[in-house]
Amino acid sequence: STVCKTQTVKAPDGTVVGEILFHTGSNGFCLNREDMLKQISEAFNSGNYNASLSLLLEEVEPEGDVNTLIGSMRELSRFSTEFATSNESRSRNVQKAAGLLNCVILEPGEELSYNELLGPRTEELGWLPAHGISGGKEYIDTPGGGICQVSSTLYNSLLLIGPDIRIVSRSHHSIPGSYVAMGLDATVSYYGPDLVWSNAAESPMFLFAYADMRTKTVYTFVYGTQPDDGTHYKIWSDT
């Protein structure tokens, strides 16, 4: 196959977050089932149990059309939060977490875990000590502090998609953060709470994430080919 077209995904500041590559299809071959069954039946009925069979292959064209696929690709949701008050370490953790989420494909029926995508948060793996909640009661500096802002940003993006996304696991913070409305956060800990979601649609979804270090804003985007039926979802907090 050869690349037919590239669809570029950009953040509001114009930064290229990722690219979706569309490949031209090529014809394949399919065994003519009726002809094969006929040959088997004839050989069996004639008592020729060692008969040689001729395979009749028929050329088959791709079911989909690349141009149709490109035309149906659209942004399903996006959400952003600001981390302007974060220090350098926390900001770098936010940037690293967004980078690990960027360009992730979610196949139909597939389930993804935020903890599995990011992996263990240790200084050896490049995570910097920054404020994080310890024991549900206080803030302490811990490697990876700040990644819950990215998981919360992603959680809101997923909610905006509607029923095509199923939230499998999500927990709120014991101490509410200021970057999202109360009740719309998603806390994570590598050996504890996790944000887990699955694709309930019949086609893949594409996740992109980006941290703008100039404006101190983290973005999450989800793209897919689900038909636009005019339904749009809003989320709010009622506390």
Predicted segments, located by residue:
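Well-ordered beta-sheet/strand-loop patches within structured domains
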Residues: 2-239
